[in-house]
């Protein structure tokens, strides 16, 4: 296994031996193997451990083990404690997303402080397979199907070339102990569900399913390199200026519909709106299309793109009965009858509203001076301008923020916070779930 990892590091030029390598060490099998292998290969390592305090005594047990293991290899050890639950609540993030943000921010802080060349994390081949399947289920393009990258900035993943089975066999051979995270044995999370339920079913069809998916991801990663190259060539010819695309140049490329989407998504246009724009290319000029930040005008020979900041404010009328509204941003709507054990996900991109407190139709608009709402969990009014200031919104972020409204009342600062007047309470009978898709 060590030889395989050495070749992988060399192939992708992940590490050199002249500067320290920071290593994320949770205490689990994968990170223990990662540190052990890198030390064996001669890299100067520094171990980093995050205690998220999410699993009671298990979290403290893992920290103690990680410290002892690093000391046994004579590797410097640094650790940090996080109040993950409070961080997630303050930012309306899932626990998983909060832990991810905290971990990688600290890793980068420590890399800069200690002069590290990179931070190595312990994603392996099976993690990559699970990621590909998750992206496929959620809907993705070639980038999502190519899986986890060996390098992402200063984060490197030397174990992507080996499987979980390889890692466990190597640990047993070396006599290394490791900690087991009890949550990894639960299928409560999507990734664990795929690991424990979906992959075993796929292996009944093809016992080599993991290897096959991993190889496919590697091939797609190579194909993505070609894809990016062609896209850059198209950009040079199609993008005449910051606000103008040439229809004629676009149509000379293969797969022009895909190229158009790749160019337009930088301006906030969804795939569905991009498809509508492409369909309009052969029709009469003059039609307008909107993203959350820009307006596009289809002219005879060009697509003209202008920022909504420079244009008159516009209000969009929404119809929750359609299920999904695509313009100017993509929102999905679901009406449910509430039950005693009704689950509420803590996610800034999802709003749970009392259906019977709303006046329809709902509307979507950008903010204006004098706007106010009652933030969820509060009793008093707050000017939206003050909310923006408190949360350090830039001018562009303010202009790009959309407000879901019921009559004159702001129901939801989309992607941020709902209004307390429309919250679910003990009298709620029906719930409207609004999901910000992009």
Curated annotation (Swiss-Prot):
It is found in: Cytoplasm. Its EC number is 6.3.4.19. The keyword Zinc does not apply. It catalyses: cytidine(34) in tRNA(Ile2) + L-lysine + ATP = lysidine(34) in tRNA(Ile2) + AMP + diphosphate + H(+). SUPFAM superfamilies: Adenine nucleotide alpha hydrolases-like, PheT/TilS domain. Keywords: ATP-binding, Cytoplasm, Ligase, Nucleotide-binding, tRNA processing. ATP binds at residues 26-31. One of its GO terms (biological process) is tRNA modification. GO terms for molecular function: ATP binding; tRNA(Ile)-lysidine synthase activity. Its main location: cytoplasm. Pfam families: ATP_bind_3, TilS_C. It comes from the Bacteria. GO terms for cellular component: cytoplasm. Belongs to the tRNA(Ile)-lysidine synthase family. PANTHER family: TRNA(ILE)-LYSIDINE SYNTHASE-RELATED. The N-terminal region contains the highly conserved SGGXDS motif, predicted to be a P-loop motif involved in ATP binding. Ligates lysine onto the cytidine present at position 34 of the AUA codon-specific tRNA(Ile) that contains the anticodon CAU, in an ATP-dependent manner. Cytidine is converted to lysidine, thus changing the amino acid specificity of the tRNA from methionine to isoleucine. This is tRNA(Ile)-lysidine synthase. It comes from Parabacteroides distasonis (strain ATCC 8503 / DSM 20701 / CIP 104284 / JCM 5825 / NCTC 11152). The gene is tilS.
